[in-house]
Structures are given as C-alpha cells and as structure tokens.
C-alpha cells in the first residue's frame, strides 16, 4: 500500500499552501519534511530530488513532483476534483489561474519591506475587490449552482476559498459586497475534510510572522 504523500518545503504557507489545502479537502493524510537551513535545500538539490532546483516538492505515488500547478493538477485528477470532461477542466484551469494571479500578490505580502507594506496592501484590496472577487461572484450568479464548475467541488473552489481566507486576514471586510463568495466559503468550510483542516492544530499554516519570514529568507536567499 502506498505511503502518505510527503511534502518538502519550509514551515510556512508560500507555494505549498494550495497543495496542503487540496490534499486536506480530498481527505488525504500527508507528512511534511520541513527545510530549516540552506543545507537542507542543498541536500535535496544535490541528490537529484528537485528537477528545477526548487521547491515545493511532493513525493507521491513513487514520483518526486515539482512545480505547484503540476502537483495540484495531479492531486485534483487522482481525487476527482478536476471536472468530468475537457470543457469543465478548461474552466477549472481558467478559474484557478485567476486565483493564482491574486495569490501571487497575497503570498508576497509578508516579505514586503515595511515601508512598502501600505502600498502592497492597497494593491491587494484593489485587485481583490475590483477585479477578482467580482469575476468569481459573477460566475456563481450566472449559473446559480453551489460550486464554480459542474455543481461539484473542484480544485478551483478549494483554491479560491483558501485565498478568500488569506485576503480576509489582511482585509477583514473584503467579502462584504460578495454574498455568493461568502456562501461558497461557508459551504466549502463546512465540508468535513475542510472543517477538520481549519481546526487549530492542523497542518494549515498561519499567516507568516516575522520569525517565519526570517527563516524563509535564510533558506532561500
């Protein structure tokens, strides 16, 4: 019987957090091997585990997968979170890429120099409230279904809800004008697997604090 997936990254959100969320939503238990020093990263590079010399890396089904989107696609396919046909997968990909564009801004926020944080937060608020949230609200309104694609949970829903939580940590009233997104967040959060993941003590990572940022900089700089 195959073992649990093993996630190789530092002990923070970064580019691994969508992978943690998706595995959790699928009800898949996983282990984590945290990078703590530059030497830990060097060891993975030197033993050939990192095809492009970078993490995240996930050991799963006898493979050492890198590149976040490739990992997410594999997990989504394996656990039936990737639509029923090509058209649904195309929509899921399109929506997930939109979420990724917003996530790219959000995940860098803790690493922004103090003097630039105000401008960075303003950008996050603007992009979330005026570009991305309205687009996803419109999708949900257009078909009146519970989820973004095919009226069933997909990796796009999980990723969107993950980023909704992240944005709300920085901008608590971000969803005030988006009732369907709020309903989606609640719906996904109440799924037993996700509800468990949202409880204290789970493998979900908190918003990076100064100590976490310093640790990441030491490993990757």
Swiss-Prot record:
What is the protein's major site of localization?
cytoplasm
Instruction: Offer one Pfam family short name for this entry.
Output: GST_N
List N6-succinyllysine occurrences by residue. Answer: 4
Which spans of this chain does the record mark as coiled coil?
none
* Gene Ontology annotations for the cellular component aspect, listed alphabetically: cytosol
- The enzyme class is transferase
Q: Where does glutathione bind?
A: 9, 45, 54-55, 67-68
Q: Where in the cell is it found?
A: Cytoplasm
Sorted alphabetically, the Gene Ontology BP terms of this entry are: glutathione metabolic process; lipid metabolic process; xenobiotic catabolic process; xenobiotic metabolic process
Q: Give residue ranges for domain GST N-terminal.
A: 3-83
Task: Describe the location of the GST C-terminal domain by residue ranges.
Answer: 85-207
So what does this thing catalyse? RX + glutathione = an S-substituted glutathione + a halide anion + H(+); androst-5-ene-3,17-dione = androst-4-ene-3,17-dione; pregn-5-ene-3,20-dione = progesterone
Molecular function (GO) terms listed? glutathione binding; glutathione transferase activity
Q: Which InterPro entries match?
A: Glutathione-S-Trfase_C-like (IPR010987), Glutathione-S-Trfase_C_sf (IPR036282), Glutathione_S-Trfase (IPR040079), Glutathione_S-Trfase_N (IPR004045), GST_alpha (IPR003080), GST_C (IPR004046), GST_superfamily (IPR050213), Thioredoxin-like_sf (IPR036249)
Q: Which Gene3D superfamilies match?
A: 1.20.1050.10, Glutaredoxin
Q: List the disulfide bonds.
A: none
Give the domain of life.
Eukaryota
The protein's matches in CDD domains, at most eight in alphabetical order, are given as:
GST_C_Alpha (cd03208), GST_N_Alpha (cd03077)
This molecule's function is given as: Conjugation of reduced glutathione to a wide number of exogenous and endogenous hydrophobic electrophiles. Catalyzes isomerization reactions that contribute to the biosynthesis of steroid hormones. Efficiently catalyze obligatory double-bond isomerizations of delta(5)-androstene-3,17-dione and delta(5)-pregnene-3,20-dione, precursors to testosterone and progesterone, respectively. Has substantial activity toward aflatoxin B1-8,9-epoxide.
Q: To which protein family does this belong?
A: Belongs to the GST superfamily. Alpha family.
What is this protein's record name?
Glutathione S-transferase alpha-3
> What species is this protein from?
Rattus norvegicus (Rat)
Its lineage reads: Eukaryota, Metazoa, Chordata, Craniata, Vertebrata
